Amino acid sequence: MTVELWLRLRGKGLAMLHVTRGVWGSRVRVWPLLPALLGPPRALSSLAAKMGEYRKMWNPREPRDWAQQYRERFIPFSKEQLLRLLIQEFHSSPAEKAALEAFSAHVDFCTLFHYHQILARLQALYDPINPDRETLDQPSLTDPQRLSNEQEVLRALEPLLAQANFSPLSEDTLAYALVVHHPQDEVQVTVNLDQYVYIHFWALGQRVGQMPLKSSVGSRRGFFTKLPPAERRYFKRVVLAARTKRGHLVLKSFKDTPLEGLEQLLPELKVRTPTLQRALLNLMLVVSGVAIFVNVGMVVLTDLKVATSLLLLLFAIFMGLRASKMFGQRRSAQALELAHMLYYRSTSNNSELLSALALRAQDEHTKEALLAHSFLARRPGGTQGSPEETSRWLRSEVENWLLAKSGCEVTFNGTRALAHLQALTPSMGLYPPPGFPKLDPVAPITSEPPQATPSSNIS
């Protein structure tokens, strides 16, 4: 190599290095903006560290300090059930019953427009990034713009989820769910955190008991008998907000989801065969392979004079193909079972989830106002006294009453319920408000006698 050629190659190398730095520099100028765009997302590196801590534990049964991490705030009665209970206990006379029903109608009327406006704002924020939009396509967004819009939607969702009495699941809880698998869950999945930008879970309605059959995964069969359903910790509703690096924001709601099965709800996962099942399948392959080799291989070896090395090679290829087919069929069956389970668990997705959350928040708002109205009416001093003292009294009374009626420990937000009640007080008695348009009564529909069809006389 001459000096001239070496200098020429070196110059090309420096030029290529300069171009490469320029290209990567343009990318680096974009991606450092992601932390600012994402706001405070879940630190997936911290999540991975917590998962490592749970892997070192021996058979953990629940997340650490679970009673402090998760507080149930969902009122486990529908509005109609709550009205009947309040009427039976506090408003038994006809006049009191009519007054409570009128108050309930007034709350419904006032909250309807409030949550309709919230839903309209949410849908306007979500529409540019809605993957299920049925209208004409809008100009495509860049990845940083899409991430910024997604974080804006999530920030707007937080107060609505709080009013709907969803509790956010902590990073420690998610680490437990990603590591620990229930022994009766035959379908297990593997999640690669490197594929995700953020993962958020909210839940309500914690229960401990036997899960509904269609929401379960696995056949629950032992070696010789069918195992009885185990009691598990699960949630009546779970909301997921997740984003993969190559995808978009996924908003989904599920019902009857066990704590150890949260990872099954994520959009990017791989079905894997549990260790015990893999060991059993391998044992079956070895036993059947030895039997085939003894019965068939020895005959081929002696009668056809095939070399031992060639016979072993053919046998290894045969067993490898058989093992690959068996494990592939097993994974396909498990993937189908997981798909069937998610079909029954899924309740709403993306834009429909926003509407469902607005309705649920309105319902919880009404129930909190009804409880505050009924309990403060029987308090000796009413709303007299400091707001802090009143809210503490209201919280204690309502929590004890809900525990006695439902058997569930519910954390009641007395301060928020008082605020709901006080916001309604100035307009009480104005239902419907002055100037509200009234619909004309529906005219009764009378059935007209069928007209006789003209008949032609045939002579």
From Swiss-Prot:
Descriptive protein name: Transmembrane protein 143
Transmembrane segments: 280-300, 301-321
Membrane topology: Multi-pass membrane protein
Lineage, uppermost ranks: Eukaryota, Metazoa, Chordata, Craniata, Vertebrata
Keyword Phosphoprotein: yes
Residue ranges, compositional bias (Polar residues): 448-459
Keywords: Membrane, Phosphoprotein, Transmembrane, Transmembrane helix
Species of the source: Homo sapiens
Chain spans, region Disordered: 435-459
